[in-house]
Amino acid sequence: MTRSSRFLGTASPPPPEEILAAETDMVVILSALLCALVCVAGLAAVARCAWLRRLTGVNPAAVGEAPPPNKGLKKKALQALPKSTYTASASTAAAADDLPCSSVGDGDSSTECAICITEFSEGEEIRILPLCSHAFHVACIDKWLTSRSSCPSCRRILVPVKCDRCGHHASTAETQVKDQPPHHQHPSQFTSAIIPAFLP
């Protein structure tokens, strides 16, 4: 055999063990750095959530104490709401005198139901909501109030919420706040309409 054929026939020499050891060390180091990067990113996300929660003032213990959702009225409460017969003469007389009409809503849309958007007919039975005096067809407002407890026009809650501490109803709170001096008011009597929310 010739010298050149001897070199071609032999396999390449195995790499030295130092090169293999350096490659495995590099893989271990890179995987450790990747794990550390994932851990730092997770901690940063948790810290950011905690910081935002503290800035917005959300207390995890108070989350369970949120007010109940706006559910509908019970049949007994629904039947207790006043009904009236619509008369066009009463609504036009009240509009001419600029007086609040007891048989219809707030003057600008007093001749139509805000739910079905049809005008009231003479002699038609309407239901008047007690807190805001908005008027609606009985069938329309009854269907609305079985799933929600607020006025469709002004979104005012119709169910009075009673304070556990003093027994006052939130529906009468606005009139009491205006009449009482500030040092006699109970904190449950304040509403968001009276006191603006604090914005940082």
UniProtKB/Swiss-Prot annotation:
State the reactions this protein catalyses: S-ubiquitinyl-[E2 ubiquitin-conjugating enzyme]-L-cysteine + [acceptor protein]-L-lysine = [E2 ubiquitin-conjugating enzyme]-L-cysteine + N(6)-ubiquitinyl-[acceptor protein]-L-lysine
Similarity-based family: Belongs to the RING-type zinc finger family. ATL subfamily.
The induction text for this entry reads:
Up-regulated by chitin.
Give a short account of what the protein does. E3 ubiquitin-protein ligase that possess E3 ubiquitin ligase activity in vitro and mediates protein monoubiquitination. Triggers the monoubiquitination of phosphorylated BIK1 in response to pathogen-associated molecular pattern (PAMP) detection. May be involved in the early steps of the plant defense signaling pathway.
Query: Which residue spans match zinc fingers labelled RING-type?
Result: 113-155
The record's annotation in Pfam families points to:
zf-RING_2 (PF13639)
Gene that produces this protein: ATL45
Q: Which domain of life is it from?
A: Eukaryota
Q: How does it assemble?
A: Interacts with BIK1.
What's the name of the protein? Probable E3 ubiquitin-protein ligase ATL45
EC number, as in UniProt: 2.3.2.27
What is the first-listed, main subcellular location in coarse terms?
A: membrane
TM spans, by residue?
26-46
